[in-house]
Design a protein with these regions (language model features):
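Conserved alpha/beta-hydrolase "nucleophile elbow" surrounding the catalytic nucleophile
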Residues: 36, 97, 101-106
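Conserved alpha/beta-hydrolase catalytic His-Asp/Glu region
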Residues: 135-139, 150-170
Length: 170
């Protein structure tokens, strides 16, 4: 049986810069930090995590996702999200945890583990957003949308993308 948001407890974690991040915790046992993908929330990892596995799932909602504050949008990066996850793990004071993620969460988990290996008892990567390339072709629409949003209001950026040749390919 999978963990569910209805049985998980919710707590707030406050980052070094004062943002409130939502964390949903389910299960009992050793800590497993499980991170969601882009535009996801705690439901994504909790649905995948078995209830009776002997682990305690910590589903940290990244900045701007789920119940978490967004903060300065210029600070949204895999580096910053990994720093948030690192600080959260350290706040648990329970030693090394298994760290995992889905898609964007996998990228965050990989960065956290690469820079702070002593915090990782294991690493689980599900559907990583990228593996061996810093900017694979399948993420080109995301880059285009980000550029358009950086230069135009959201409505104009949306229209521009919808009318683009790239949008017609997806």
């Amino acid at each position: 049986e999978a963990c569910s948001v209805t049985t998980a407890t919710t707590k707030e974690y406050v980052t070094f810069d004062g943002l409130k991040l939502s964390v949903k915790i389910a299960g009992k046992g050793r800590p497993f930090l499980f991170l969601h993908g882009l535009c996801g929330d705690a439901l994504q990892p909790l649905e995948l995590f078995p209830d009776d596995a002997g682990w305690q799932c910590h589903a940290l909602e990244s900045r701007g996702h789920g119940g978490s504050d967004i903060g300065d949008m210029r600070e949204l990066s895999i580096r910053r999200l990994a720093e948030d996850a690192t600080a959260y793990l350290e706040s648990l004071d329970r030693g090394a945890a298994v760290i995992g993620g889905v898609s964007m969460g996998a990228a965050i988990a990989l960065r956290l583990t690469a820079y702070r290996p002593e915090l990782a008892a294991g690493l689980v990567l599900g559907r990583p957003a990228w593996v061996d390339q810093p900017a694979p072709a399948n993420l080109a629409p995301h880059r285009q949308i980000a550029r358009d949003l950086g230069q135009h209001d959201p409505g104009t950026a949306r229209r521009m993308f919808e009318e683009s040749a790239m949008a017609k390919t997806i």
